[in-house]
Design a protein with these regions (language model features):
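Glycosyltransferase donor-sugar binding loop
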Residues: 195-209, 226
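Donor nucleotide-sugar binding/catalytic pocket of nucleotide-sugar-dependent glycosyltransferases
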Residues: 119-153
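Acidic donor-binding loop of glycosyltransferase active sites
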Residues: 235-251, 264
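Nucleotide-activated donor-binding/catalytic signature segment of Leloir-type glycosyltransferases, i.e.
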Residues: 209-234, 281
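A charged, aromatic-enriched C-terminal amphipathic alpha-helix characteristic of glycosyltransferases
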Residues: 293-297, 306-345
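Conserved donor-binding/catalytic core segment of Leloir-type glycosyltransferases
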Residues: 157-176, 181-185, 196-197
Length: 351
């Protein structure tokens, strides 16, 4: 950054977005491409290992370690190791990492070792909410997860069905869909007018079969255990009166933001991030339960959301133009620290 007039050349760890790419990545890609002072570079192995850039920005580095076969995975591991080596040796490439998840994924010892090495190389971290715990003195910028209003706004909406409880997204055990089904079964005994829809690809055939077995004798249940297109997702969410996300652990949830962006209230576990979200967007839009989701939580949340008088939650702090500018500021801070060979400590940089 010897010439302050030159745009920062920033390489992301993601390539060109595809149809199945996480919308967060696609919208970030668009926001960065439109941000002044940034030359936005998508990932390629050749450019990452041999090209010139000022900043490298990691998202989910574990994705780079897995190929389509065992041989491919070994090759990906070696390439990622070389990339980490380049970043570790360079005095002129800053490393930024977005903290999407708090914990490392379940993986083998070699991959976990490399992921920890990558994490230690970060000159600056971006966190998506104000409650993400990081070690004292970690240089960080809070950039709230952007909304999906523009992304889903082009899709036609469904008519909201009274009593319809919906959940969507990749169906994994930690997302608590089985517990939601059991709570729905108990709630049905008290209010036979409610209904339920589950949409999203199951992570395993065993989980899909377990859910089919659980709902086999339940009325008013729709299971769509396949990947949802944007149009299908919008139909599911807007056709529901309440979106239930009964995760066993929740920190940064794109599904919560998707539902709120489509003006549907959510029921989520009570924790610090969700309490902060409720205070931000309006508590009536973010219903919470303690412990495990149960029939009481479902029925009480339905009663509460029927009292909502506003048309939509307040997502004004989650504009993508603001996110692009905040990323640019974080990149400049990280590069200043790297060029000075001093990691910034003891202060956070506000977006």
């Amino acid at each position: 950054m010897s010439d302050p007039r030159r745009p920062l050349r920033v390489m992301q760890s993601f390539g060109a977005p595809r149809v199945t790419t996480n919308p967060y990545i696609t919208m970030l890609d668009e926001a960065l491409a439109a941000t002044d002072g940034i030359e936005h570079v998508r990932f390629s192995w050749r450019e990452a290992l041999l090209g010139r850039y000022d900043v490298f920005h990691w998202h989910w580095p574990e994705v780079k370690l897995h190929g389509s076969s065992a041989v491919s995975s070994v090759g990906k591991y070696a390439l990622t190791g070389l990339l980490a080596l380049r970043h570790g040796l360079s005095r002129r490439i800053a490393v930024v990492r977005t903290v999407h998840n708090l914990d490392l994924p379940d993986d083998n010892a070699a991959r976990l070792w490399l992921l920890r090495r990558i994490d230690r190389q970060a000159d600056h971290r971006i966190v998506l909410n104000e409650t993400t715990p990081l070690p004292a003195g970690t240089a960080q910028t809070v950039i709230l997860h952007g909304h999906y209003r523009d992304w889903y706004g082009v899709q036609p909406r469904a008519e909201r069905l009274r009593g319809r409880l919906g959940t969507f997204g990749g169906v994994r055990r930690y997302k608590g869909v089985s517990g939601f089904v059991d709570a729905y079964a108990d709630a049905m005994a008290r209010d036979p007018e409610i209904s339920m829809i589950v949409g999203g690809k199951a992570s395993s055939a065993e989980l899909a079969e377990d859910l089919r077995t659980r709902v086999a004798d339940l009325p008013n249940v729709v299971l769509e255990l396949e990947f949802l297109s944007d149009a299908e997702l919008v139909q599911l969410v807007t056709g529901s009166e309440l979106i239930v996300l009964a995760y066993r652990f929740m920190h940064n949830s794109g599904s919560v933001l998707a539902a709120l962006s489509l003006d549907r209230p959510v029921l989520v576990p009570r924790n610090a991030p969700n309490e902060a979200l409720a205070a931000e967007v309006g508590p009536e839009w973010v219903q919470m339960y303690d412990g495990e989701v149960d029939a009481d939580a479902l029925l009480e949340a339905l009663r509460a959301v029927r009292a909502i008088t506003g048309d939509r939650p307040d997502l004004s702090r989650r504009e993508w133009d603001d996110a692009g500018a905040a990323h640019a500021a974080a990149y400049r801070e990280a590069l200043r620290a790297r060029l000075a060979r001093v990691r910034p400590r003891g202060r956070a940089v506000e977006a």
